């Protein structure tokens, strides 16, 4: 079942340690088959160097395991909520990558300080509000998804393919699992660049709207011309 998607999700998960986005098992990637309403996700707590295609877990959009012998990632409810709320996305990544997590722990969004950021994220990468005690003590992973979508009430998830969960870490997404990992890698890099920029110049300001528009829209706008 869903062998092609399983392979894509496996390969995307294996990219996380390659790009140094994870330590031990601190992360997961999923992908969705929209037509069938099924999600493939990494199993919980399995080391990346042990993962095989047969370990991938298939769940439906209510979280029931459809295929697989292992438990799905503990973050599955977050992934499922985001898929239901963001219909344009096809893959999701969660990590505790160092620099993005630093910003999440500081409770700060990442301003668009340069064109590297603007090529991928159309403005400041937001940080959610802190979760309440009730949210944390309740259906925690589902509530994590809800606090993300609350943060995106006035944001387009296709123009802003990532978020920082306050005190937790980053989530990123894309058109498919590989694209989601790509965006997660960029998020980590711009988080590092921004932190180091503020070390050199604590008064650094975001780039102008004109420059932000130029760089984002030349890659993603209606008249995009970047690339082949």
From Swiss-Prot:
Needed cofactors: Zn(2+)
Gene Ontology biological process terms, A to Z: L-arabinose catabolic process to xylulose 5-phosphate
Assigned GO CC terms: cytosol
Xref: InterPro entries: Aldolase_class_II_sugar_metab, Aldolase_II/adducin_N, Aldolase_II/adducin_N_sf, AraD
EC number(s) given by UniProt: 5.1.3.4
Presence of the UniProt keyword Isomerase in the record: yes
Chain sites annotated for binding Zn(2+): 75, 94, 96, 168
Record protein name field: L-ribulose-5-phosphate 4-epimerase
Organism encoding this protein: Geobacillus stearothermophilus
Lineage: Bacteria, Bacillati, Bacillota, Bacilli, Bacillales
């Amino acid at each position: 079942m869903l062998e092609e998607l399983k392979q894509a999700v496996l390969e995307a998960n294996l990219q996380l340690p390659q790009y140094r986005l994870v330590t031990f098992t601190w992360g997961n990637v999923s992908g969705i088959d929209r037509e069938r309403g099924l999600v493939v996700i990494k199993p919980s707590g399995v080391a990346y160097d042990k993962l095989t295609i047969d370990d991938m877990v298939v769940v439906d959009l209510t979280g029931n395991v459809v295929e697989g012998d292992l438990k799905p990632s503990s973050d599955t409810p977050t992934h499922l909520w985001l898929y239901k709320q963001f219909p344009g996305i096809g893959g999701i990544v969660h990590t505790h990558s160092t620099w993005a997590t630093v910003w999440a722990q500081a409770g700060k969004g990442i301003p668009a300080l340069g064109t590297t950021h603007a090529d991928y994220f159309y403005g400041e990468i937001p940080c959610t509000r802190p979760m309440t005690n009730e949210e944390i003590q309740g259906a925690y992973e589902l509530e994590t998804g809800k606090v993300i979508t609350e943060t995106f009430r006035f944001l387009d998830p296709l123009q802003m393919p990532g978020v920082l969960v306050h005190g937790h870490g980053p989530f990123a997404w894309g058109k498919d699992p590989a694209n989601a990992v790509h965006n997660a890698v960029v998020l980590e890099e711009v988080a590092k660049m921004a932190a180091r920029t503020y070390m050199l110049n604590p008064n650094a300001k975001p780039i102008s709207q004109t420059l932000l528009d130029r760089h984002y829209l030349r890659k993603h706008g209606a008249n995009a011309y970047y690339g082949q």
